[in-house]
Amino acid sequence: MTRWLCTLVLCALAGTAAAGNEGHPVTLWRIAGATNSVYLLGSIHLLREQDHPLPGVIDKAYDDADVIVMEIDMDDVDPVYTQAAFNRAGVLQDGTTLQDLMGEEAFTAASEAAAAIDIPLDMLAKSEPWLAAITVELMLLYRIGFDPALGVEMTMTQRAAADGKPIEGLETIDEQLAFLDGLPIDAQREMLLQVLSEGAAMSESIGELIEAWHHGDTATLEDAVLSSAVGLDELNEVLVNSRNRRWAETISTWLDDEQDYLIVVGALHLVGEQGVPALLEKRGFGIHQLSEPASLR
């Protein structure tokens, strides 16, 4: 589960120098429309300084695109509104506590696991379990040097703003939070318990994801996702598969357009039979994975 949530929150990139980026696939696809191209990039939400620059083929896809599309419209994000939205969706307002929602046995297990990785669970007393899980995950990622300000979305947002390229969103922040807040409480408990219990092994788990993402190794990414989501079918359906189907429907309408698009979403959404590339291929669109050295054809 930690690898699954890491993929959702992180999907990190490896490689400390340009030479390390050559001669391998990248988690990037080109779809040939009737009159245009659409690129699908597996998103890296948080990065470290040493993970830059991005592979050259990603830069070329960005340069080729007229429109940048992300899970949410990043150039329209209001930090004050976003914080308020998180508070509305995930902060308990009626006197109920995280301990109440977890139950005595699960909360005891969570407290012991949190203490083992030096996480002060008391500070999350007013959080719903899903928000507590994401908060813990981000705290652990920050500890090992990952930063959303260095991630692909922020990098692309800054470039698009400088270049005057429009950014569009597939969803809104409220929609994304509704997916999480609507999860059954049992699934939320499991999210938090798994993140805490596997937190000590996060560096190794992330290392595997980084290596797979860096080499465009979709088989390994898919295996990590599937093995981590065993027994969490409802969670996977709500947060991944149902969204993939909606996105594939939307993207298919852009494949008869005069504009070229670069679509940046979590790599979790681009692997396997239920991934967006596979869904679009089933609709009859030509699609292929791109590689370094940088070439779009």
Task: Give the label of every model feature segment.
Residues 20, 27-239:
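Structured, acidic catalytic/metal-binding patches in enzyme active sites
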Residues 14-18:
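N-terminal signal peptide c-region/cleavage motif recognized by signal peptidases
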Residues 233-297:
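A cross-kingdom marker for long, charged
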Residues 23-26, 247:
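Alpha-helical scaffolding within the catalytic cores
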Residues 4-13:
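Sec-dependent N-terminal signal peptides
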